Amino acid sequence: MLEKAKAGKYAVGQFNINNLEWTKAVLLTAQELQSPVILGVSEGAGKYMTGFETVAAMVKAMHDSLGITVPVALHLDHGTYEGCYKCVKAGFTSIMFDGSHYPFEENLAKSTELVNVAHQLGLSIECEVGSIGGEEDGVIGMGECADPEECKIIADLGVDMLAAGIGNIHGKYPANWKGLSFETLDAIQQKTGTMPLVLHGGTGIPADMIKKAISLGVSKINVNTECQLSFADATRKYIEAGKDL
């Protein structure tokens, strides 16, 4: 899915799902637009939905009953080492191991193990270098830019996609945000070659920056905050309108 996107100079959207309604909305929209899509599941959302097995079963049943024909991946977002194994067992098609908060050597060791496990089972895997700014499931990243040399080392493990910090942030971007570091992204692209790169924190990034990031190798863009805000706004308006529930 992502190799095709990189070759075609476009990016596939990952939209996080937090319940049945979100899952249905994402699947139906992807089908309507005839677009491949990645369903992202954080460990917090997985816990809320009573476990990764429940999520995998719900997605499969909904995919089949809705007659979805576009490519769909079920992907663990910002997974821990333990969470990756749980999702492998639950039937996810793709996992992300976020070891960016570990010392690099520990990140490398755990990534190496999980790449081997994922590929033995025919799953794709995303790894991260350089923590993404903001908070994700209680883990706070400072938003530093990744080291291109470290990115190459992780990419050479055979990961299917690489998330690298380039000044991007989870959640709302502050007014004084300096923007994406395209110099860093270009250097990472030069080091990793055909490796599809991932841009986390897609909400609020201007369209021109998105387009430039895609031109420099980004093939997957994650969106969650924008959906959270839209969902909250629509719910608030519905209740304030005094409609019967």
Feature map (PLM): residue ranges:
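Alpha/beta enzyme core
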Residues: 1-4, 19-45, 50-69, 78-195, ...
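Metal-dependent phosphohydrolase cores
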Residues: 14, 206
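Glycine-rich beta-strand-to-loop/alpha-helix junction loops that act as flexible
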Residues: 199-203
